[in-house]
């Protein structure tokens, strides 16, 4: 057996070419790059903003979380092709030390990430525009929602993002027992619409009304005012300001409700009845019963609202749970939905489905590295979070438009990366063409061919 490094230009990310073709049809990264102002002298630059953005986000999609990774990836001509470089071998670089390295080094990408800070006369010549980025994410996210949707569910949640040291905005959170950020997310299914990085010295729901004020008009502009919008969240979002805004703007909501003594009293009779039935042997533990009633807090709410209570007896003991909603018990005109918002169905089938958003946040942090917020400044960490959100939006578009009906339609980002992008590839470059050979033993050739066919059928944006 003999081993050497004479195999030529090889890459482990051959399937990343799918991302290149998807960008050609969607133009998302180009639009995202337009959210930056480039003050550099264009006569002397070698990496355009769109190429820097593409390099960073495609790196996340292909599993490379750290800027230091790009000091090695910049030598990979396949990555250069994915990012739109016309000279994938880097032979035309102006400095001799950079020849053979088509992509930017970590220092250049670092200056891009620090663009959220004030412009420095010498080093920081690219400026991010947060308002435009936020507007773009909402616009492209809403556009990704199925066009014929009659009902749109917006899931809100906050999560912890542990810090890496004494960073800007570092505070201790009593619930998570750590120093962390507290990002706020909004998803529609697997489509990210909003992500705000915040310090943790605040209520988890803070900023939800401001997010809704941007998201809801964008949805109604595309789908019309008749579309039903339902906001869903855990008990941290059962706040007067959010519920009152929804009621004033004809938006429905369904939130968890933290238990208290007054709420517990409403379930006493249900628990007594269940215990009697267990004693008689007519039911067995675990068992549950749902109750509906009107409820208002003593001070914080301005009106009584519909509350569903779940009296549940588990082997470990009683488990009372509550939700508050303005969804109509009778449903809407469609007879098929008549019982959809009855107490049991509303809690078990609709509210509990909120838990799927936890998987989206898990994908953000584990698969797309949204928790790699290790710069000192909050603003540059927000930009890193947006990079991960844009990457997630690309993957959700791929699943909806290309992977629909395939075995990867409902797969996680990590599974899609592993099974579709991580393909050994050899590049051969000549004067006239670039030839890419993929691994002969790749087990999903049929799926890859179908993806290629569907990408070719996508309409290029005007």
Question: Which residues are covered by each model-predicted region?
Answer:
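Structural preference for beta-strand elements that scaffold enzyme active sites
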Residues: 151-155, 228-230, 252-254
């Amino acid at each position: 057996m003999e081993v050497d490094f004479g195999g030529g230009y090889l890459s482990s990310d051959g399937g990343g070419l799918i991302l290149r073709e998807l960008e050609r049809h969607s133009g998302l990264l180009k639009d995202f790059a337009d959210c930056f102002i480039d003050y550099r002298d264009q006569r002397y630059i070698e990496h355009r903003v769109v190429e820097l953005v593409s390099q960073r986000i495609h790196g996340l999609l292909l599993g490379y979380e750290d800027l230091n990774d790009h000091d090695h990836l910049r030598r990979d001509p396949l990555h250069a092709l994915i990012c739109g470089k016309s000279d994938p071998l880097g032979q035309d670089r102006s400095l001799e030390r950079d020849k053979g390295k088509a992509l930017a080094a970590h220092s250049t990408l670092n200056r891009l990430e620090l663009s959220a800070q004030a412009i420095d006369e010498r080093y920081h010549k690219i400026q991010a525009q947060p308002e435009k980025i936020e507007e773009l994410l909402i616009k492209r996210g809403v556009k990704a929602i199925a066009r014929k949707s009659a009902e749109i569910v917006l899931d809100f949640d906050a999560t912890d993002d542990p810090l890496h040291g004494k960073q800007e905005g570092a505070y201790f959170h009593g619930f998570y027992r750590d120093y962390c950020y507290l990002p706020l997310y909004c998803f529609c299914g697997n489509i990210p619409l909003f992500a705000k990085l915040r310090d943790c010295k605040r209520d988890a729901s803070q900023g939800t009304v401001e997010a809704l004020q941007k998201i809801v008009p964008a949805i109604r502009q595309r789908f019309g005012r008749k579309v039903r919008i339902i906001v869903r969240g855990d008990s941290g979002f059962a706040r007067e300001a959010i519920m009152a805004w929804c009621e004033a703007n004809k938006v429905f909501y369904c939130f968890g409700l933290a238990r208290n003594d007054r709420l517990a009293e409403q379930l006493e009779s249900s628990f007594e009845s269940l215990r009697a039935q267990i004693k008689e042997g007519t039911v067995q533990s675990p068992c549950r019963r749902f109750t509906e009633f009107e409820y208002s807090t003593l001070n914080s709410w301005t009106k009584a609202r519909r509350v569903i209570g779940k009296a549940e007896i588990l082997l470990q003991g009683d488990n009372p749970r509550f939700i508050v909603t303005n969804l109509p018990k009778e449903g809407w005109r469609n007879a098929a939905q008549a019982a959809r918002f009855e107490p049991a169905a509303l809690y078990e089938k609709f509210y509990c489905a909120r838990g799927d958003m936890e998987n989206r946040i898990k994908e953000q942090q584990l698969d797309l590295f949204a928790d790699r917020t290790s710069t000192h400044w909050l603003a540059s960490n927000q930009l890193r979070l947006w990079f991960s959100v844009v990457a997630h939006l690309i993957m959700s578009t791929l699943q909806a438009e290309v992977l629909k009906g395939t075995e990867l339609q409902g797969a996680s980002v990590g599974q899609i990366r592993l099974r579709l992008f991580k393909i050994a590839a050899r590049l051969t470059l000549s004067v006239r063409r670039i030839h890419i050979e993929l691994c002969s033993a790749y087990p999903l050739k049929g799926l890859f061919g179908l993806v290629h066919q569907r990408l070719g059928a996508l309409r290029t944006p005007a």
